[in-house]
């Protein structure tokens, strides 16, 4: 079961990594948060699993818009950067 979960996480994270390496460098940075939404999604999926990680990523993406205050929004609330 552990290998299947790991493989599923890697498959789900693949489009995020492709975005980070191929698309993100070509566009101007527009994420209102730090870490960026793609970094947040990748970390959430790897740490919490596919279902909870995707829900956390979708929640984050829904808050990232031009009218958002943005700022520092870590995956782990006690993380101080």
Curated annotation (Swiss-Prot):
Family as reported in the entry's similarity comment: Belongs to the UPF0161 family.
Task: Write one Pfam family the protein is assigned to.
Answer: YidD
InterPro entries, sorted: Membr_insert_effic_factor_YidD
Q: Is the keyword Membrane in the record?
A: yes
Where is the chain membrane-spanning?
Answer: none
Listed GO cellular component terms? plasma membrane
What domain of life does the native source organism fall in? Bacteria
* Function statement: Could be involved in insertion of integral membrane proteins into the membrane.
Q: Which UniProt keywords apply?
A: Cell inner membrane, Cell membrane, Membrane
What name appears for this protein in its UniProt entry?
A: Putative membrane protein insertion efficiency factor
Could you tell me where this protein is found in the cell?
Answer: Cell inner membrane
Tell me which SMART domains the record gives: Haemolytic (SM01234)
* Source organism (scientific name): Legionella pneumophila (strain Lens)
* Topology with respect to the bilayer: Peripheral membrane protein
Chief location of this protein within or outside the cell: membrane
User: Coiled coil where?
Assistant: none
Query: What HAMAP family does the record tag this protein with?
Result: UPF0161_YidD
